[in-house]
Amino acid sequence: MRTQIKCYSIVLVMVFSFAIGPAFSAEPTITVWKSASCGCCQRWVDYLQDDGFEVIAHNVDDVVSIKKKLGITNPALYSCHTAKVGGYIIEGHVPASDIRRLLNEHPKLMGLTAPGMPQMSPGMFSIEPKGYDVLQFNAKQETSMFSSY
């Protein structure tokens, strides 16, 4: 009888582990603010979704005001869209692999930026990043290299 109860207990634990495991391992949702008329912004959103992220995209008339509300005041960091994930700000065409690395390492940063609109970046003219840098920035908006492609 006790052996039978142990077996049922093990089975129940396994079932619940498989059922709720993905909920705990899922990546946080990325919230994106972008212009409705910007095709590369939508392609970056699509790229992130294809890479497994859940993305909530907001079309806004003034993306710069969103950047400022989030605390990005240095125009040198700006790109065409702004995102927030896991407490970090993502500015521009940052590759999904860099976002995952940021979320896994949890550095004391404000976020990542791919300033401007790098031509060979996800959402622009390439899925594989080439020929540009992704910078990390702190609350003082001082930058240093995060990744180079």
What kind of feature is each model-predicted range?
Residues 9-19:
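Bacterial N-terminal signal peptides
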Residues 24-25, 84:
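Short glycine-enriched loop/turn motifs at secondary-structure junctions
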Residues 1-10:
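Bacterial N-terminal signal peptides that target proteins for export
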Residues 76-149:
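Thiol/selenol-based redox catalytic cores and closely related redox-interacting motifs
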Residues 35, 61-66, 117-118, 124-126:
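Mature soluble domains of exported/periplasmic/lumenal proteins and thiol-rich metal-chelating peptides
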Residues 27-29, 53-54, 78, 108-110:
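Loop/turn elements at helix/coil->beta-strand transitions in domains of secreted/extracellular proteins
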Residues 45-92:
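N-terminal, post-signal-peptide region of Sec/Tat-exported proteins
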Residues 25-51:
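Local sequence-structure signature of Cys/Sec-based thiol-disulfide redox active-site neighborhoods
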